[in-house]
């Protein structure tokens, strides 16, 4: 009797181990990484100010994207940037932005949480960290694959008050609306 129980336990463990190995193999076979081409990609912020609007574009950022090759569903997205790399085509404004962010070398990041589809539109959710404050944001996005090239586009609405930042004011009457639009266009090779 003892031998039968021992054999059954060994077989159950062996079967479970084999099933886990098979599941890991299947999962890893479908997973892939996306090597982002920064020359073809863009992350941009649009802002409205008193009497005008302006845009800032990140000249550099880090991006690590993994996902399912077949469905193009992301499993991990990690973006990081230095605000010194956010250029608005106005050097004075860029310097003032660094002061507004608290000086030093402020950084930002985004970490993916999940995706879902609603009425034919795919949405992503992630944690955005700016000025030391983390907030969960949701936004629509699209992903297209042409051969090994993957293109991901999306737009997110932000309010800089949510990140503990003060109203941007110049010359006592000019302000920058706290509602910002961040758009991204990421292009990369699926590996």
Describe each region flagged by the PLM.
Residues 31-191:
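Low-complexity, acidic/polar, glycine-enriched regions of mature
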Residues 6-19:
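Bacterial N-terminal signal peptides that target proteins for export
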Residues 18-28:
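Bacterial N-terminal signal peptides
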């Amino acid at each position: 009797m003892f031998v039968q129980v021992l054999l059954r336990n060994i077989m159950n463990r062996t079967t479970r181990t084999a099933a886990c190995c098979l599941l890991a193999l299947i999962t890893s076979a479908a997973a892939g990484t996306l090597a982002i081409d920064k020359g073809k990609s863009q992350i941009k912020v649009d802002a409205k100010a008193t009497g005008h609007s302006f845009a800032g574009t990140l000249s550099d950022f880090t991006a690590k994207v993994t996902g399912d090759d077949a469905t193009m569903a992301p499993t991990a997205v990690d973006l990081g940037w230095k605000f010194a790399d956010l250029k608005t085509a106005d050097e004075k404004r860029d310097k003032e932005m660094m002061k507004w962010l608290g000086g030093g070398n402020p950084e930002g990041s985004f970490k993916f949480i999940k995706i879902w589809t609603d009425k034919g539109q795919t949405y992503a959710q992630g944690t955005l960290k700016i000025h030391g404050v983390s907030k969960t944001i949701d936004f629509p996005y699209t992903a297209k694959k042409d051969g090994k090239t993957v293109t991901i586009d999306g737009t997110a609405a932000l309010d800089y008050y949510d990140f503990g930042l003060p109203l941007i004011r110049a010359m006592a009457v000019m302000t920058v609306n706290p509602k910002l639009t961040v758009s991204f266009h990421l292009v990369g090779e699926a590996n």
